[in-house]
Amino acid sequence: MKTANKQTKLHVRKNDTVVVIAGNDKGKTGKVLKAYPQACRVIVEGVNIRKRHVRPSQSHPQGAIIEREFPIHASNVKKG
């Protein structure tokens, strides 16, 4: 049986300014950096920041702990 690949449409796009309406970052505003329509998630600048450990490389010879944005569900943001 084949499953339908339904294309989902998000109410926000890249570079839109949005306000977080639910979750730990409620009330914060930021620009949408990337949208994932299939997963119904967006990455918002300065929102949902987590720390990631990075292995040693040429850019980080000793390794590092980097803070970066992670996706949040699109239903938790509104244009604003």
Swiss-Prot record:
GO molecular function, one term: rRNA binding
Signal peptide: none
Any single GO BP term: translation
Matching InterPro entries: KOW, Rib_uL2_dom2, Ribosomal_uL24, Ribosomal_uL24_CS, Ribosomal_uL24_KOW, Translation_prot_SH3-like_sf
Listed PROSITE patterns: RIBOSOMAL_L24
Gene3D superfamilies membership: 2.30.30.30
Residues spanning the membrane: none
Record keywords: Ribonucleoprotein, Ribosomal protein, RNA-binding, rRNA-binding
Pfam family, one: KOW
A GO cellular component annotation in the UniProt record: ribosome
Superkingdom: Bacteria
Entry's family note: Belongs to the universal ribosomal protein uL24 family.
Stated role: One of two assembly initiator proteins, it binds directly to the 5'-end of the 23S rRNA, where it nucleates assembly of the 50S subunit.
Subunit and partners: Part of the 50S ribosomal subunit.
Name of protein: Large ribosomal subunit protein uL24
Origin species: Prosthecochloris aestuarii (strain DSM 271 / SK 413)
Gene: rplX
